């Protein structure tokens, strides 16, 4: 009896020890580590961080460390990512020197970096944003009508640009991408007005962007476009060439006589 009782107790102790060991192992496996993995940040927050780094390197000298603006440049709070696309993708920013109007230059940033800058500026106070997707799928005929109504008085009917007052000018539109055209309509840079969705909705802006891309990349089957300035230079060339031809013919006839 005593031996049987000892065997039962020993067996019970063994089961208890085995159970405690298993429980300890499970607890250790499930317990949180002192170096728990930090949840991955969203792509948005990473873009904001990278955009701020780009801003501090290339923009803060003029616009301030906190985008508050200063003597060298205006505040960027609330301007939106559309302004970034227009200014940076066209090469106007960073500004190389103070002038009446920022000229178009070679672009210093990649499209990815421009988008990161835009995300950062957008995070500061919102503002106009360029919609994603195809920006040149609008109605071409309607885009031409809207362009002639709202844009041609400054940019010329063919987007060749023109002079304005006080040393400013409406730039030629040929090098501009659809994003730059759309960003200009949303942000209203320099002397250009800002077109809200109440004035030109998203379809209207897409139509204008398509028309600009079409007219600035169209071929000239009639020969030299003469800057697309219209009938004035065309008439002048015809007059000079025609009169020159008449003078030559007259001299030739006189010489033969």
Language model features with spans:
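Extracytoplasmic electron-transfer domains, predominantly the class I c-type cytochrome c fold
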Residues: 77-124, 164-220
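C-terminal capping alpha-helices of c-type cytochrome domains
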Residues: 12-33, 106-131, 196-256
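Short, Lys/Arg-rich N-terminal segment immediately upstream of the first membrane anchor
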Residues: 1-10, 173, 226-230
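Periplasmic/extracellular electron-transfer cofactor-ligation site
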Residues: 44-48, 52-78, 90-99, 123-132, ...
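N-terminal Sec-pathway targeting helices
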Residues: 5-16, 187
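Ser/Thr/Pro/Gly-rich low-complexity linker/stalk segments immediately outside membranes or between
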Residues: 33-46
């Amino acid at each position: 009896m005593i031996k049987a009782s000892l065997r039962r107790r020993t067996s019970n102790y063994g089961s208890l020890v085995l159970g405690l060991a298993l429980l300890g192992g499970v607890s250790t496996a499930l317990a949180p580590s002192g170096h728990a993995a930090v949840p991955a940040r969203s792509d948005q927050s990473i873009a904001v961080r990278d955009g701020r780094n780009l801003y501090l390197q290339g923009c803060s000298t003029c616009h301030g460390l906190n985008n508050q603006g200063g003597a060298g440049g205006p505040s960027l709070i609330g301007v939106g990512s559309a302004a970034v696309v227009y200014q940076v993708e066209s090469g106007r920013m960073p500004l190389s020197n103070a002038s009446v109007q920022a000229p178009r230059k070679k672009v210093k940033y990649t499209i990815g970096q421009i988008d990161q800058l835009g995300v950062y500026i957008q995070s500061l106070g919102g503002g106009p944003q360029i919609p994603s997707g195809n920006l040149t799928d609008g109605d071409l005929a309607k885009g031409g009508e809207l362009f002639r109504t709202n844009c041609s008085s400054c940019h010329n009917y063919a987007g060749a640009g023109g002079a304005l007052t006080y040393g400013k000018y409406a730039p030629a539109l040929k090098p501009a991408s659809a994003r730059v055209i759309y960003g200009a309509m949303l942000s209203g840079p320099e002397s250009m007005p800002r077109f809200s969705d109440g004035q030109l909705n998203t379809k209207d802006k897409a139509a204008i962007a398509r028309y600009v891309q079409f007219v600035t990349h169209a071929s000239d089957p009639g020969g030299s476009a003469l800057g697309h300035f219209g009938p004035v230079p065309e008439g002048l060339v015809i007059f000079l060439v025609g009169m020159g031809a008449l003078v030559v013919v007259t001299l030739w006839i006189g010489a033969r006589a």
